[in-house]
Amino acid sequence: MKITTISNSLVSLVALVLYALNGAAFALDVNITQDMSYAAIEQNGETFRIQRIQDQSNQLTGGFAKTSRKCPPFCIQPMIVAPGVETFGELEVIQFINEQVKTNQGILIDARTPSWHAKGTIPGSVNVPFTVFALSRNDKELIEVMKKFDVERRKTAASGYWTDLKDILGIEKKPNPFWDFSSAKNLLLWCNGMWCGQSPRAIQGLLKLGYPAKKLKYYRDGMQGWQILGLTVTTPK
């Protein structure tokens, strides 16, 4: 009986030591916050781990290491991109991924052109170029994109040259008669950084279409800020 008890105790002790060693092996020195070492997101059947680069001597290289770009067009963007639109930092982006993207209540949008997106993006992002939101509201591509945001074209929506002209002139009847935003998803848009106007233009385009400002978020630091903090960047397949 004593031998069995000692044997069981020894097994438990060994298991405890192995668990501690295993935890130490995977412990990170460079965490996101004191309480969060990483965040995981699944996209297209693949799981991505958002964490910071662990090499503490790592330095930014390439285009995002630059401090100066010709302005215009690469001018500093305001902290508040539009009234009612919240501006997010990195922790809020990760929280949005965890709480909104994972539950299909929100979409993280890489608003850059496809060539930029192909070079690397934030895990969990969907590429919708800012140019899409400048299309005519009757354009099939825009209508399909809006459907992905759970925004449907109203069955009674008017269309045609005269309707589009009134919209351009700002004399179209409000509230928006064309789109139904009652079930619209929350959107968090980003681009290359605080000097990039792609996501601000996307947000302005969405607002012009009637998208509720309270459902739009802006990650101003964008890819440059994300890389400065050594956070995970994925290359789309």
Q: What is each PLM-predicted segment?
A:
Residues 25-122, 130, 137:
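Flexible, polar/low-complexity N-terminal or interdomain linker segments that lie immediately upstream
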Residues 107-110, 125-129, 186-190, 216-218:
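Structural recognition of the beta-strand scaffold that forms the well-ordered cores
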Residues 113-117, 132-135, 193-197, 222-226:
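Solvent-exposed loop/turn segments at secondary-structure junctions
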Residues 146-223:
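Catalytic cysteine-centered active loop of the rhodanese-like fold, especially the PTP/DSP P-loop
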Residues 61-84, 139-172:
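Aromatic- and Gly/Pro-rich amphipathic surface segment
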Residues 11-23:
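Bacterial N-terminal signal peptides
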Residues 229-237:
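Active-site neighborhoods of enzymes that stabilize oxyanions during catalysis
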Residues 1-13:
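Bacterial N-terminal signal peptides that target proteins for export
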